[in-house]
Amino acid sequence: MTGSYGTKRILLLFMAALLALVFGPGAVPRAHAAAGTGYWHTSGRQLLDSNGQQVRMTGINWFGAETSNFSPHGLWTRGYKSMLDQMKSLKYNTLRLPYTNQLFDSGSAPNSIDYTKNPDLQGLSGLQILDKVIGYAGQIGLKVVLDRHRPDAGGQSALWYTDAYPESRWISDWEMLARHYAGNTTVIGADLHNEPHAPACWGCGDQTKDWRLAAERAGNAILAVNSNWLIIVEGVDGYNGDNYWWGGNLQGAAQYPVRLNVANRLVCSAHDYATSVYPQPWFDDPDFPNNLAAIWDKNWGYLYKNNVAPVLLGEFGTTLTDTRDQAWLRTLMAYLGTGASGMSFTFWSWNPNSGDTGGILNGDWTTVNTAKQAYLDPYLLGAFDGSGDPGGGDPGGPGTPPAVSCKVAYTVQNSWQGGFTAQVTITNSGSDPLNGWTLEFAFPGDQKVSQGWSATWSQSGDDVTAKSMAWNGAVAPGASLTVGFQATGSSSGTPAEFDLNDQPCEA
């Protein structure tokens, strides 16, 4: 193995020298830059990265920091890195992260967190927890949109201000966040206020109610601090007597566009839901679901189709219990389009504890609602750069890995007819630290890994491989880590042997 590497290295050096002679200094061909690099901007209806490549958000909402928990939900059950790894494994590339202005108050202490699963969150403020989530999201190639979801943790507000949290506080908190994350290209945009609705209006001219004017004030204040952010502006609910979902009616943007002081920063955002959330009249139209495209065109799709601005469908979700919900979701995804040129979206929600819709995760906060995920799968583009995967070979460098002493504990967590989830705890029982690891085992039956977390999972026949990620490759002597997966098949067959870096482990 070492000799093979040395031969390849000599050949590579020779080829590099030859290319330099043939093409001259600086002429060696360079790899194409990874999509999603840097800050993003707009061009007509498209989003472009810092290299001018077309990009698209195909993401998910993870709520909780807008509630009195002041942190993303589910951390009472799992680690935040495990959550984000699973999002990446499911091919989401963007995280819409709701928050409340109350989170930044001195008395707002994060709570309902299992610190044995999230030890690095112990003692942190709400903003510091957001820093951790955003930091790791960027490390694994996810982008983040911040969503001012509520002024206080008690509930949604129709207007962007309340008596307790006036407009001045709304704007100053946005300015603070824009400064705080300046230079951090993981955070690409600000969703200014979630779901404005009556008495909010669009284009009415009333400074206390006109959401379009308020969005201009906040958007330009943000851009004065951080000119790189996308400014994401949702609609209202009604325009000229035509009512739609809260935050989804952008009809007024045709006559009254949002005016920003920095060009190519505006993204228009709508929300759309199924009959499980509210029985809108169009769900009972005899032409349903063929009537939906015209409704979407009228309220927000025209902005994309007429090349006015990119559109982000910031929230859409369903329990899928009604057959009309199934038709709605199938039709909506097709309407948004495929590939990098389609309309952006962030599904509501990752969380299973959204009362109207449920989530991508089931109630155990671990297994996936595969029925919902199947509707989204063809449209998900996957994470951008920053995955931390060093490519082929051992992450610690070329050559033969050191001998390993290890213990493995395999535990089935949940099982149902046709599937199960399991976790594998790896303990370094040797005297040397691990700097990157590869775990291998074989299923005794027809089990197939469908997804995994906290490792890069693959399967060939019965043989399963889990490779360390950038954040958990280093394992000190005596330390343990836990990875997990979801699989199809019976949970009764337990792997008999486990190898770590090609060395057998005690099981």
Regions found by a protein language model. Give the residues of each.
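Asparagine-centered strand-capping/turn motif at beta-strand->loop junctions
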Residues: 426-430
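Aromatic-lined substrate-binding rim segments of carbohydrate-active enzymes
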Residues: 76-152, 211-226, 325-342, 346
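Aromatic-rich peripheral "rim/lid" segments of glycoside hydrolase catalytic domains that contact
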Residues: 323-402
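N-terminal carbohydrate-binding accessory modules
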Residues: 29-96, 110-113, 117-120, 391
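Low-complexity, acidic Ser/Thr/Pro/Gly-rich terminal tails and inter-domain linkers that flank the onset
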Residues: 400-418
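Terminal connector regions
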Residues: 477, 482-507
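Short, solvent-exposed loop/turn segments enriched in Ser/Thr/Gly
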Residues: 414-423, 435, 481
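Extracellular glycoside hydrolase catalytic/binding regions
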Residues: 76-77, 161-163, 168-189, 193-341
